């Protein structure tokens, strides 16, 4: 099996401090304080730290930092050196600085006053509401005290829209909306019982319709049967008047 090799970390205090990002590597201790390369190296390390830091804006750091204008004023108040090289170095440093929060947003032009703009907007809305109220009360365009005819027409259209401009609701036309009955509507047993009841009602209706009205012949037949089924008295039996079937002289019977 391969053995695991753990590399020991060397003491960082004895390591050579190098700044990467430029074309050449150099030791910071060998440079002079006024050297442009030292300042550029410090700016490069500063940019790298900010780039590798957590995404977002830290309010405390921004408050502690100076703005670009303040830095320019501070550099202007410092004593100028006679050499042109130092002035060029300072200008390059100012240009190389990171933009602050104020520089990231567009500056105000002060061309539009926000307060007056909002007041005009509110007054316009109130005027339209007053016009609509006057129109609803009077019902005539002559009663409107306005100069803008387009706004009057818009208000009129909003109060009395065209009938063809919208779709009528089904409930307004008297249609019954679909109602979800839940589990009852999807239960198989309830559906079967409902079908059975419908079939039974249909059969009962057919039976009632099939029964014809009673005629005179039906009434005479029923009367004859009632007479035949009456109990026979002794007198009638002795006389032979009442029989189950009446026999005539010619031999026929009914």
Curated annotation (Swiss-Prot):
GO biological process: alternative mRNA splicing, via spliceosome; mRNA cis splicing, via spliceosome; mRNA splicing, via spliceosome
Subcellular localization, as worded in the UniProt entry: Cytoplasm; Nucleus
Keyword terms of this UniProt record: Cytoplasm, mRNA processing, mRNA splicing, Nucleus, Spliceosome
Effect of deleting the gene: Leads to abnormal splicing of introns featuring long spacing between the branchpoint and 3'-splice site. Decreases protein level of genes involved in chromatin organization. Sensitive to cold; simultaneous knockout of cay1 or sde2 leads to a growth defect at both higher and lower temperature.
Cellular component GO terms, alphabetical: cytosol; nucleus; spliceosomal complex
Composition bias, Basic and acidic residues: 69-83, 205-216
Region entry Disordered, spans: 69-90, 195-216
Coiled coil start-end: none
Pfam families according to UniProt: Hep_59
Ranges of compositional bias, category Basic residues: 195-204
Disulfide bonds: none
Family of this protein: Belongs to the TLS1 family.
Complex and partners: Component of the spliceosome. Interacts with brr2.
Role, per record: Plays a role in pre-mRNA splicing by facilitating excision of introns featuring long spacing between the branchpoint and 3'-splice site. Assists the splicing of several components involved in chromatin organization, such as several shelterin complex subunits.
This protein's name: Splicing factor tls1
Native species: Schizosaccharomyces pombe (strain 972 / ATCC 24843)
């Amino acid at each position: 099996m391969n053995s695991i090799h753990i590399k020991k970390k060397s003491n960082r205090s004895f390591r050579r401090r190098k700044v990467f990002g430029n074309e050449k590597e150099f030791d910071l201790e060998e440079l002079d304080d006024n050297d442009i390369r030292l300042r550029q190296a410090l700016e490069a390390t500063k940019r790298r730290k900010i780039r590798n830091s957590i995404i977002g804006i830290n309010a405390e750091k921004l408050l502690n930092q100076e703005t670009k204008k303040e830095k320019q004023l501070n550099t202007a108040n410092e004593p100028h050196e006679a050499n042109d090289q130092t002035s060029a170095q300072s200008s390059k440093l100012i240009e190389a600085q990171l933009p602050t929060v104020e520089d990231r947003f567009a500056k105000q032009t002060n061309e539009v006053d926000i307060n007056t703009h909002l007041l005009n907007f509110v007054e316009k809305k109130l005027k339209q509401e007053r016009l609509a109220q006057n129109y609803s009360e009077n019902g005539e365009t002559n009663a409107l005290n306005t100069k803008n005819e387009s706004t009057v027409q818009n208000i009129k259209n909003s109060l009395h829209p065209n009938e063809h401009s919208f779709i009528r609701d089904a409930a307004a036309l008297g249609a019954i909306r679909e109602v979800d009955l839940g589990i009852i509507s999807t239960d198989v047993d309830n559906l079967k019982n409902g079908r059975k009841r419908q079939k039974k009602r249909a059969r009962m209706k057919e039976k009632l319709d099939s029964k014809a009205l009673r005629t005179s012949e039906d009434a005479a037949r029923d009367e004859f049967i009632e007479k035949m089924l009456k109990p026979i008295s002794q007198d009638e039996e002795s006389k032979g008047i009442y029989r189950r079937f009446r026999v005539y002289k010619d031999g026929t019977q009914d």
